[in-house]
């Protein structure tokens, strides 16, 4: 009898341990079901395919060639790592490099690679990979962005040893650090490839990188219209319940949202304002929204012959706008109103230096009157002498820009300002022509707060200072800031720049974009947080699961009443 009792105790203990192990499987919270004395718990099971839909398709899965293709850029960011990466706070953080140093003269940087950095095929990442990658961009026939070639041709690169890379700059240039976020290419695979051969190389369709995802073998995504990725188990060391992510490429938003509604896909990475009502109406879809590193602005033409060359007119146009109404009515609330040329996530953002342009038609009217633009009896448009206050508003010939331009036109009409909308398919060319008073477009700022190429005096001739803002002190502040490496030393220069920017108002920020991610309820244990980069939405992917099994266990004892 005693022996029999001992076996009963042992079996009970083993049963309890089994139950506890099931309950704690991969850190998931178990779901208990009760039936008499028998309970079941739902635990993750490995398997299934996570399908994500996107509009468009990549052309090259290559970090040196993907800049012009939004889908390609996102996929490349999942497959490749740079020496560094941009953190959620906009600051540069280690990636393949574990650390770096800057010389006292600010011209020499040395990066030390991580000892455990390896390619998807298991080969170690070495300084030779860095030299090869940056060397391709230095070649005259490099087929990627011309700006990359210009930058890297001015840099001397040397491998100090297998794990140390040295860069020597022509002069101190703090924004250079962000250039090291670009993904590296494997020298051991591409050593004999020249820059001219990059565009047609098979590597672009089936690359080997270092990122958290790798391209699955035996597929032709250019023909099938979908790309399968598998987890890089050197990153996901504990494994993942979902073994495959499949990106499906759709020609337009209509076909993408239809696929989501029909259950053909389990996620959509970018729900636009136009897609939001349909997505929100699906009971089995969850929506996650976060701020995105992009904003929309109004750029003023400050040349003498522009009708907005007077500060009071620009301020009046700003006060006449209800930016929150634009976001709420045209973007379904998918925007965040803020001030200035820096995103709130940037360390250079300082709202204390900026005027908050709250909607104020009375102030707008007073500023216009003070500038000489008055409204005569019986007239609907203000005039200064015989000249009517007529704004030429330039924007892209697509949505949501056309609808935004029309709404802005209506709001300015309320203070008796006439507006003509000019739509273009080539914004850069139209801006360079100067044939506009105000331009409406998007800005995707770099993580580094350097705005020299947009607002300096040099950018009037060899940059993108399309507003023609010619301010010597602002230009000097930007130039000084980019030559310093310490954030503490740079900050006062950016504060000065912001004060000058605010006092001149060469541009008015309308809103920061948001990124809305749609996810099926069939994806369990998914927790989506910050969405600064494409990787962010998969931060907790190790916990996600599509399949599960119900396992019977003994019910927990019920306390006596």
Task: List the predicted regions and their residue ranges.
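N-terminal lobe/hinge region of extracytoplasmic solute-binding protein
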Residues: 53-104, 135, 208-210
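Detector for C-terminal structural segments
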Residues: 12-26, 296, 320-355, 362, ...
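Aromatic- and charge-enriched surface segment that lines or borders ligand/interaction sites
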Residues: 98-143, 160, 166, 259, ...
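A structural "hinge/loop" feature
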Residues: 54-76, 96-97, 123, 146, ...
């Amino acid at each position: 009898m005693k022996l029999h009792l001992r076996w009963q105790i042992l079996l009970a203990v083993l049963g309890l341990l089994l139950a506890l192990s099931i309950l704690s499987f991969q850190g998931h919270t178990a779901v208990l079901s009760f039936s008499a004395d028998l309970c079941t718990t739902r635990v993750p099971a490995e398997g299934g395919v996570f399908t994500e839909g996107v509009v468009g398709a990549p052309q090259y899965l290559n970090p040196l060639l993907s800049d012009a293709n939004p889908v390609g850029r996102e996929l490349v960011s999942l497959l490749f790592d740079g020496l560094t990466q941009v953190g959620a706070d906009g600051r540069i953080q280690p990636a393949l490099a574990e650390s770096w140093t800057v010389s006292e003269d600010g011209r020499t940087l040395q990066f030390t690679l991580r000892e455990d950095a390896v390619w998807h095929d298991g080969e170690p990442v070495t300084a030779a990979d860095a030299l090869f990658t940056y060397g391709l961009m230095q070649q005259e026939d490099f087929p990627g962005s011309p700006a990359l070639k210009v930058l890297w041709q001015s840099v001397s690169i040397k491998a100090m040893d297998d794990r140390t890379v040295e860069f020597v700059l022509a002069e101190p240039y703090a924004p250079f650090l962000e250039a090291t976020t670009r993904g590296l290419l494997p020298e051991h695979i591409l050593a004999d490839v020249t820059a001219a051969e990059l565009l047609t190389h098979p590597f672009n369709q089936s690359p080997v990188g270092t990122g958290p995802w790798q391209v699955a073998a035996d597929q032709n995504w250019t023909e099938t219209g979908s790309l399968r990725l598998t987890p890089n188990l050197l990153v996901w060391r504990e494994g993942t319940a979902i073994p495959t992510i499949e990106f499906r490429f759709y020609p337009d938003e209509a076909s993408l949202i239809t696929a989501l509604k029909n259950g053909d896909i389990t996620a959509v990475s970018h729900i636009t304002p136009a897609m939001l009502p349909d997505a929100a109406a699906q009971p089995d879809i969850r929506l996650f929204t976060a701020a995105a590193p992009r904003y929309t602005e109004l750029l003023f033409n400050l040349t003498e012959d522009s009708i907005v060359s007077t500060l009071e007119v620009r301020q009046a146009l700003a006060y006449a706008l209800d930016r929150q109404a634009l976001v709420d009515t045209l973007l379904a609330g998918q925007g965040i109103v803020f001030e200035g040329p820096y995103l709130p996530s940037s360390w250079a953002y300082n709202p204390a230096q900026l005027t908050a342009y709250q909607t104020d038609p009375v102030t707008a009217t007073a500023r216009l009157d003070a500038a000489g633009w008055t409204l005569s009896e019986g007239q609907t448009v203000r005039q200064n002498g015989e000249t009517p206050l007529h704004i030429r508003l330039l924007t892209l010939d697509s949505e949501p820009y056309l609808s935004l331009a029309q709404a802005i036109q209506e709001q300015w009409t309320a203070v008796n300002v006439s507006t003509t909308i000019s739509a273009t398919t080539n914004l850069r060319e139209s801006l360079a022509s100067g044939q506009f008073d105000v331009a409406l477009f998007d800005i995707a700022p770099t993580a580094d707060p350097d705005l020299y190429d947009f607002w300096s005096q040099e950018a009037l001739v060899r940059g993108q200072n399309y507003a023609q803002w010619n301010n010597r002190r602002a230009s000097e502040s930007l130039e000084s800031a980019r030559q310093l490496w310490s954030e503490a030393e740079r900050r006062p220069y950016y504060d000065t720049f912001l004060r000058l920017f605010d006092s001149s108002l060469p541009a008015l920020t309308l809103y920061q974009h948001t990124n809305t991610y749609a996810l099926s309820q069939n994806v369990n244990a998914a927790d989506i947080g910050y969405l600064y980069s494409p990787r962010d939405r998969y931060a907790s992917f190790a916990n996600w699961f599509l399949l599960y099994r119900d396992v019977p266990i003994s019910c927990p004892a019920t306390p006596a009443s």
